[in-house]
């Protein structure tokens, strides 16, 4: 009779341990579930992103500390109120000057040669009609002097990404997560161009990696916007309209196979004989651009492993077998969500 209380105590202890174990298991499952739900919300595709809510009506702009939308600056205003500071860039079509307007830094682009005015004005029309979260903000323009004023981005283009991340101020941002998000935004822009208000547009100013990267600016809050819209020809497959990026021979490993002269070195290049192509040239270039954007930070190799299959699809020799930009974008988003979930679960287990 004296042993019964000890048996009861033993039984009670086991019951307590079982209850504690079940509570712990329930906590782990609940935390994981909440993390999954949170990450799904954070990384699910959204119609509106970083600056979409700040877009102004057509013909207006808002930059930096300006709270309200203002009309695009006119020739008179640009002449009176915009002050050039220094030359910061120069391409085939225009020179770009860091300038100042009412204490704000802006980029002033000026035509280099009147022979290229058609390209310049085409770029202006594109900027006017395609203002969105994917495109640099148009501040003003003057057709009389062939001048375009846009928002200035001090971090430069995607070509300067590694240099930007090397500064102590930004080293904390140099993670595979942030680099993959930049990759997603780059592909989002390609997808926007392929489904633009003007139809299917091809980014022709991209015959080598540096040239392709220089078309996209890195904003101060680490987003990507298209900056140069001078060379965006339209493809319309239903009407049989394909394009050629310029009238000169294109060479190199960066461009798609269909952009190369197909008749060998023994036949002199002729634009009349060169076949046209479609937007799948942009898809071919995605893996090389993304490889640069991912860099060599810790975790980037895991990201590359998860992107291997979709990048293999992008590299198909037959353009029709390559995925659309939307398919690439969907895959990138899924990979980011998956890796973020895996990381969150691993961190939760470590805490427990």
UniProtKB/Swiss-Prot annotation:
Ranges where the Protein kinase domain occurs: 82-352
Disulfide pairings: none
Location of this chain's protein in the cell: Endoplasmic reticulum membrane
Gene Ontology biological process terms, A to Z: carbohydrate phosphorylation; protein O-linked glycosylation
Cytoplasmic-side positions: 1-16
Keywords: ATP-binding, Endoplasmic reticulum, Kinase, Membrane, Nucleotide-binding, Signal-anchor, Transferase, Transmembrane, Transmembrane helix
Membrane topology: Single-pass type II membrane protein
Membrane-traversing stretches: 17-37
Protein name: Protein O-mannose kinase
Gene name as annotated: pomk
């Amino acid at each position: 009779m004296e042993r019964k209380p000890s048996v009861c105590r033993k039984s009670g202890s086991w019951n307590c341990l079982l209850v504690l174990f079940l509570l712990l298991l329930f906590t782990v499952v609940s935390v994981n579930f909440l993390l999954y739900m949170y990450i799904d919300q954070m990384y699910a595709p959204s119609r509106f992103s970083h600056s979409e809510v700040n877009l102004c009506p057509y013909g207006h702009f808002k930059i930096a500390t300006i709270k309200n939308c203002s009309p695009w600056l006119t020739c008179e205003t640009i002449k009176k109120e915009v002050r050039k500071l220094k030359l910061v860039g120069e391409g085939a079509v225009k020179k770009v000057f860091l300038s100042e307007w009412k204490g704000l830094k802006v980029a002033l682009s000026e035509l280099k040669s009147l022979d290229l005015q058609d390209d310049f004005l085409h770029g202006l029309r594109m900027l006017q009609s395609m203002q969105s979260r994917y495109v640099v903000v148009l501040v003003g323009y003057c057709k009389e002097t062939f001048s375009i004023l846009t928002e200035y981005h001090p971090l430069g283009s995607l070509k300067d990404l590694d240099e930007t991340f090397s500064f102590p101020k930004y080293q904390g941002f140099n993670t595979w997560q942030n680099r993959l998000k930049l990759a997603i935004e780059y592909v989002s822009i390609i997808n926007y161009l392929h489904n633009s208000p003007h139809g299917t547009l091809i980014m022709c100013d991209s015959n080598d990696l540096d040239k392709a990267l220089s078309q996209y600016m890195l904003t101060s809050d680490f987003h990507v916007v298209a900056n140069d819209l001078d060379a965006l020809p339209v493809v319309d497959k239903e009407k049989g309209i394909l394009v050629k990026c310029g009238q000169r021979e294109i060479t190199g490993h960066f461009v798609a196979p269909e952009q190369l002269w197909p008749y060998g070195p023994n036949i002199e290049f002729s634009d009349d004989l060169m076949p046209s192509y479609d937007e799948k040239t942009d898809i071919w270039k995605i893996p090389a651009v993304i490889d640069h954007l991912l860099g060599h930070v810790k975790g980037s190799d895991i990201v590359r492993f998860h992107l291997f299959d979709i990048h293999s699809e992008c590299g198909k020799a037959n353009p029709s077998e390559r995925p659309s930009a939307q398919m690439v974008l969907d895959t990138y988003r899924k990979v980011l969500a998956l890796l973020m979930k895996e990381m969150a679960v691993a961190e939760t287990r470590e805490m427990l």
